[in-house]
From Swiss-Prot:
Similarity-based family: Belongs to the globin family.
Pfam families: Globin
GO molecular function list: haptoglobin binding; heme binding; hemoglobin alpha binding; metal ion binding; organic acid binding; oxygen binding; oxygen carrier activity; peroxidase activity
GO terms under biological process: hydrogen peroxide catabolic process
KW Heme (keyword) present: yes
Protein name per Swiss-Prot or TrEMBL: Hemoglobin subunit beta
InterPro entries the record matches: Globin, Globin-like_sf, Globin/Proto, Hemoglobin_b, Hemoglobin_oxygen_transport
In-chain residues carrying the UniProt-annotated modification N6-acetyllysine: 59, 82, 144
Modified residues annotated as Phosphoserine in this record: 44
Keywords: Acetylation, Heme, Iron, Metal-binding, Oxygen transport, Phosphoprotein, S-nitrosylation, Transport
PTM annotation (S-nitrosocysteine): residues: 93
PANTHER family named among the record's database cross-references: HEMOGLOBIN FAMILY MEMBER, HEMOGLOBIN SUBUNIT BETA
Globin domain sequence ranges: 2-146
Amino acid sequence: VHLTGEEKAAVTALWGKVNVDEVGGEALGRLLVVYPWTQRFFDSFGDLSSPDAVMGNPKVKAHGKKVLNSFSEGLKNLDNLKGTFAKLSELHCDKLHVDPENFKLLGNVLVCVLAHHFGKEFTPQVQAAYQKVVAGVANALAHKYH
């Protein structure tokens, strides 16, 4: 991902304020509600029968936190996203058979959740930088599929 120094600083500064527990659970929950076909990858998560069930599901929250912790690792290695996410790409491709388009969907949902949480602080410039990052992460996670 090519970010300017200013973009990197903006992404890093905002990310330092992110509550990964809260934002991770909300982002994954919203993905499962807005794009219900993604639920098929989470059969073991129990009740996903309604938006309230999804958003209150402790397994969704826990996995969302795990996802954002991985995303945090990516932010520390923006110049080597493919290397950073190589094992996760392999897992999601070979074992879990996740449609790589879902990585893009989750990235876009994450941007929406960040905008919701940070309001005016999430300026168009910050959003543009985050869109680059989530696209880079989605591309890195899809790398094994190519």
